[in-house]
Swiss-Prot record:
GO terms for molecular function: unfolded protein binding. Involved in the early biogenesis steps of box H/ACA snoRNP assembly. Keywords: Nucleus. The keyword Nucleus applies. One of its GO terms (biological process) is box H/ACA snoRNP assembly. It comes from Schizosaccharomyces pombe (strain 972 / ATCC 24843). Residues 106-128 are annotated as: Disordered. Residues 1-89 form the CS domain. This is Protein shq1. The gene is shq1. Its main location: nucleus. The lineage of its organism: Eukaryota, Fungi, Dikarya, Ascomycota, Taphrinomycotina.
Length: 451
């Protein structure tokens, strides 16, 4: 069966579902709803949704078919008028997983002493108490923060999945066994199926050191014309970010029809996130890599965009998820942007880091839009499409369920993080000083000739 394109919206009393099913016989459509589940079926289409609130299938519910547009327009009354159903635009999260498995218990559980009768009477009340987290002071570099608590709070719908070697949540293996050997110019790990995470980090740093070219960096430091044009470019997310800062935007983002179609087609996954902190942190290199490519192409992706994004993102090129702090990621992003792409400039790298902060601060919908853009680029490449299966499909689904407070904390700490040129372990200041001396000497020579 085919999952059709669909959209959802709401008002105070009703939920509206529009399903695109052209060339059908409307009389054969089967529609029903019970509590928060909605079913739509007409060969060859099937749609099963799980709404964030309950609806009623009573006399007020109705459906009509627009032959010209091919849409079935369905209306269900809300069980509780005035209730706001959140995230109706995050379509992937509404699709019911047809292959659900029972949630498996963790291998290790916390157990308590046998409760007394008085304890048992108060157990249900204690369980209902909301766990309080000081979101303002959460810090990604704090070794004492209980990331397992965040997992228990946010991932009630997620189920157990075995993990292995690389990719999102370190849960994939075997996918790069042959792909890495056939025209994959992004992959930088010689044996991705056999290389442990710590070794991947070491290989990444070593390759960056070997790739850094002082003359290339010197040339981009001296010749600023194209660099300045790139720095003055304003991407769409920066425009939106500036409006938000000025209080002129409410952050509401409406997905395009292409984005909605991509969301509906995303494979719905179930996860047990072993290391939530790591999943949030490894999102940053992806966003940075996109920000660099988007800025240097002035918003018009090229045939090199896949390579740019994949190579700049250590999450993809080196399968490196072995980061413990935001500063480690900052240094890795800056180093890669100064070692691999066409434009290698310190100011450009820092600007792309600021772009990363802007995207993260706009929230999960803008992050999702960026991930869908990256995913679309990789989807149409003969070799690099594999990274959708390893990284991008999962991130595009997971971000729809990510914790807004943690994303805000991540964005804040990205903005607060600073590094020096010395922390790249490359002689950037020395190179720049040599360029300045050369310029001064050249100017003095020109003046003496004129005299």
């Amino acid at each position: 069966m085919i999952t059709p394109k669909f959209e959802l919206r709401q008002d105070e009393e009703f939920v509206y579902l529009d399903v695109h099913t052209p060339y059908i016989k409307a009389k054969n459509v089967e529609i029903d709803a019970f509590n928060n589940e909605v079913n739509f079926c007409i060969a060859p289409y099937f749609l099963k949704l799980e709404l964030p609130g309950n609806v009623l299938d009573d006399d007020r519910a109705n459906a009509s078919y627009d032959i010209s547009s091919g849409f079935v327009h369905i209306k269900f009354p809300k069980e509780t008028p005035g209730e706001v159903f959140p995230d109706l635009d995050l379509l992937t999260t509404l699709l019911v997983n047809q292959n659900k498995e029972p949630v498996k218990k963790p291998l290790i559980e916390e157990v308590e002493d046998t409760p007394s009768p008085s304890t048992s009477q108060n157990a249900s009340k204690d369980e209902e108490k909301e766990v309080k987290i000081d979101w303002q002071n959460i810090h990604f570099d704090d070794p004492d923060f209980d990331w397992g608590l965040l997992q228990r709070l946010d991932d009630e719908k997620m189920q157990y999945t075995s993990t292995s070697q690389y990719g999102f949540n370190n849960q994939y293996s075997g996918l790069l066994k042959y792909n890495a050997l056939v025209g994959n110019e992004i992959n930088q790990i010689p044996e991705p199926e056999r290389t442990p995470p710590s070794t991947r980090s070491e290989i990444r740093v070593q390759l960056e050191d070997e790739k850094f070219d002082a003359e290339h960096y010197m040339a981009d430091f001296y010749d600023r014309e194209m660099i300045d044009e790139i720095l003055h470019y304003i991407p769409d997310y920066i425009g939106e970010f500036l409006l938000v800062q000025q209080g002129k935007s409410d952050r509401l983002l409406e997905f395009t029809s292409e984005e909605k179609e991509a969301l509906a087609k995303l494979p719905k996954r179930s996860y047990l996130i072993d290391n939530p902190k790591n999943v949030y942190l490894c999102l940053v290199p992806l966003i940075f890599a996109y920000a660099y490519d988007n800025r240097t192409t002035l918003g018009d992706p090229t045939i090199e965009s896949c390579w740019n994004i994949g190579t700049l993102s250590s999450t993809i090129s080196c399968l490196d998820t072995n980061f413990l702090a935001i500063k480690d990621i900052f240094i890795a992003c800056i180093r890669r942007s100064l070692a691999y792409p066409l434009y290698r400039n310190w100011d450009l790298a820092l600007t792309c880091w600021k772009d990363t902060h802007a995207i993260l601060s706009l929230g999960k919908r803008w992050i999702l839009r960026v991930l869908l853009r990256i995913r679309n680029l990789f989807e149409h490449h003969d070799v690099y499409y594999i990274y959708n299966a390893i990284v991008l499909n999962d991130y595009a689904y997971w971000i729809q369920t990510a914790n807004d407070n943690v994303l805000a904390a991540l964005a804040y700490q990205v903005s607060e993080c600073t590094i020096t040129k010395e922390e790249t372990n490359w002689p950037l200041e020395e190179i720049e000083a040599n360029v300045q001396e050369t310029i001064i000497a050249s100017d003095e020579e020109s003046e003496s000739i004129e005299k």
